Amino acid sequence: MSQPAKVLLLYAHPESQDSVANWVLLKPATQLSNVTVHDLYAHYPDFFIDIPREQALLREHEVIVFQHPLYTYSCPALLKEWLDRVLSRGFASGPGGNQLAGKYWRSVITTGEPESAYRYDALNRYPMSDVLRPFELAAGMCRMHWLSPIIIYWARRQSAQELASHARAYGDWLANPLSPGGC
């Protein structure tokens, strides 16, 4: 029996203590031996990112998960800084930048609005697939495989049972992320 893929879960939430949904989602990940949970705001409250350390973490894992709330149609500021600095030319892209080629990228997003708000004719004017396009493009730039995102809409309004169900499904996927049908 083969070992499950090593997963690096990059968690980015500037107000993590107030996010019930994200804590519930993280709990199963913390109990899995193949998952490294890396809380960016806990490690870099001053935004001074240790780029060589982060790049080493990326090299050591096959699946990279970006878990964060949707902030202004993007990600929290520290994760944006992390993406710009760590996924540098020569490491992740451009000449010689093949360190992440063949790895897997999955975004796990919580939102403050219902799924119905993400349509061309709705409040946000665009579907979530369009909103997340920059992340998909970044994965492509790094020659990574883009896995369909996991999105928890209206996270604050999810019942405890709904959040527990999402967390179980997420934990099951994290335990064996590259199994047939698991992507």
Curated annotation (Swiss-Prot):
SUPFAM superfamilies in alphabetical order: Flavoproteins
Gene Ontology BP, a term: potassium ion transport
Root EC class: oxidoreductase
EC number per UniProt: 1.6.5.2
Subunit composition and interactions: Interacts with KefB.
Function: Regulatory subunit of a potassium efflux system that confers protection against electrophiles. Required for full activity of KefB.
Name recorded for this polypeptide: Glutathione-regulated potassium-efflux system ancillary protein KefG
Protein's organism: Escherichia coli O6:K15:H31 (strain 536 / UPEC)
Source species taxonomy: Bacteria, Pseudomonadati, Pseudomonadota, Gammaproteobacteria, Enterobacterales
